[in-house]
Amino acid sequence: MQFCRFNVDRLGVVHGDEIFDVTDALDTLPDVKWVRSLHDPFVAALDQVAVKARALLASAPRLNRNDVVLEAPVALPSKIIGAPVNYHAHLDEAQDDHGLHQGAKVHPIDEIGCFLKAGSALVGDGATITLPKDAARVDHEAEVAVIIGKAGRDIAASDAMACVAGYSLALDMTARGKQDRSMRKSCDGFAVLGPTLATPDEVADPAHIAFSLTVNGEVRQASDTSLLIRSIPELIEMCSAFYSLLPGDVIMTGTPAGVGPVSTGDTIVVTSPELGVLTVNVA
């Protein structure tokens, strides 16, 4: 199923241009006693919610996708994890382009590991990103994101896919400069996720998810997860060796070659045959 959040925490199932409002399926969620749980309650209970959502589809109100405001499909990730330079072609361009490396040494993912983005950077499809005034430049980085469905620590790659709740498109927006990576990657709107959470049955082979990015209609990035240096199971193993992964945690798997700057007025579109279309505007 393709789940979306829309119009302030309503739950929808996406079929083409229609959204079926199945918000009542959230009645299956347990009561949260604290102000904020440590994980995303919707993702933690996704299997139960999906059963209720299927039962509601026949009678659910239908809305046109153009008439709703989509939010990031995950509301409360405890962590947004990024995988730097996880495509060989991007590693090559990052080492060669001063605009990307800004004079700093570029390390392969096996040397530098992963990084964290602030949860406050999270936005969904249709968002407007405001460029920070102190950035040397801001670049687009199209990615496939993995959404964790089951808690785990020290997860072996051979067991990793059983922990996956679904997949989404992502933009790991990045400001260039001398500041620490976490500062440059955590500006408001710099973690774009959407348009939906596609459950594993929607993806034929997560090792072969094709995706591309355009800016104002010009193709800048096009790749496939088969070209990842560290595969999705290997990334889950790597991350869980350092962090407990919780339901709703987002792992952005890395961006391919073609990273480039964006400017005020640009429209960025990330497209995947299986994961849909993710659009943001730059202000």
Task: Tell where the protein language model's regions lie, with residue ranges.
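N-terminal non-catalytic cap/leader segment that marks the start of a structured domain
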Residues: M1-A104, P108, D201-A204, S212, ...
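Glycine-enriched loop-and-adjacent helix/strand subsegments that border the catalytic/binding cleft
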Residues: E71, P77-P233, F242
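Short beta-strand edge segments in extracellular beta-sheet folds
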Residues: N281-A283
